[in-house]
Amino acid sequence: MEITEFTPSRRTVCALAGAGALTAALGPARAAVAAGPTPLTDPFFSYDRPARYGVVREDIKVPLRDGSHLAAQLYRPADATGKAAVGRFPGIVYEFTAYAANLEYFGDAAAYFVRRGYNALVCQARGSGASPGTVDPFSPQEQRDNHDTIEWLARHPGCTGDIGQMGVSYGGHTSLLVAVNRPPHLKAIIPTNALHDWYENTIYRGGIYSPRIRDWQRSTAPATLQTYAAHPLYDDFWRGRSVMTRWDRLTVPTLEINGWYDRYRDGMVKNFLARPEHVWLVSGPWDHGDPATQYAGIGPGAYLAWWDRWLGGDRHAPLPAARVTSYEIPGPGAGTGWHQFDQWPPRDAHSLTLSLRRDGSLAAAPAASGEAAFEVNTGTAAPNAGQQLLFSTAELRRDVVLAGDATLTVRAAFSASDGNIAAVLHDEAPDGTRTRITAGWLKASHRHGHTEPAPVIPGTCHDLSVHIWPTHYRIAAGHRLALRVSSDDYPEIDSDVPAGRVTVGVGARGSTLRLTVRNP
């Protein structure tokens, strides 16, 4: 078979055939969507009520079952004299985290809830801040400590015994992990930008170590530089740091705050798909971190509505109007803003499969069989022309909305005994500039799972199914959907495989890209 090398400047000339949204995108032109994003009008997100209390802080030690303790700050409603108000109030573990440097920030943010009648606890995980021990992020020990913290707060004489937990990133991870441990007094959680599985989301993406986490490891938990490297396969070490392995135990009401640009969007969506009867999903136009600092439409009022409902016993406090509240990115401008759906992917979404073709195009019709090849990039620089394959659709005459995950099913032969496949989707503008939409990665020896490596026989064709993380993204008319296939995607994954060549089957009986799309 002929081997064709593709370059970044290669453009397609073929139109897309077949049914579905992309076919319509190549039909007669239609008017563009109205300028400006759809606003978030659901009353849940504008909920608020007046503050009634002041705030008093107590520096405490939370006792643990093994005789150790955790340092924490307990913020309680205060009366007019500045003393703790008489009565009992529901409790929120506002952050259970290893980020001791942020304690004052957390305390200031927690005060919003304290002034409205909640106790709020900011807790330093074992080995962080003033808590003795060694940080072992999201470990079974840390989960036991978190369980003990919730039960301690429930027994506090100023608490009703109804406890919630919330947090961003580290605190979001701990919120989900403690929930599947089922402490008796935990009633609901709000995890923001959080995991479903520490191995898959963060450390070994598709079985490939992610270098972007190493600086975090060095600064937060240096011992993990050795322990994580010692567990390249999915074993009990990782099962103990996973929500996924215990999805059946995620039974408390869960308000997931996800970002479509966030590094944990795949995990947040997977949690929802696994437990749709217990999870409400909010996915917005933000990256990793606190959404309130990136987007003015998400504030503490929505969280207060959640706590008033599940901890305060107010059955009139609103819930989100739909199970899924999602911002169609990019925006403002290209994306249409907020939408609400009863499920994810949306009910009107459907799968569309495109073929990777010899001329560098993506189309529903596969065309002739063939091969294309690229060289393995063993460095950290972006791949050059010979180290990647590029495929793209024709220019779209109508908008196309991606609403869900995607899968690259690739037939590949490796000249070495292992290899990596990185699949990156881009929005290509008429001037040729590309905007990254989403991506997925897979080590060839992990093509049958991460628990046991599968042999990679040099020169033999292997079928790999690369999961591409979900998105809710509008590709505008006049743009193209572009797919880059290579061995690297630094800093998302390490370039950790031997030098060599990867040959990819294209055209009929070759590689395909399955998309989830909805009508624009």
Locate predicted features.
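N-terminal secretory signal peptides
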Residues: 1-8, 19-26
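Short beta-strand/loop turn elements enriched in aromatics
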Residues: 36-39, 222, 374, 432
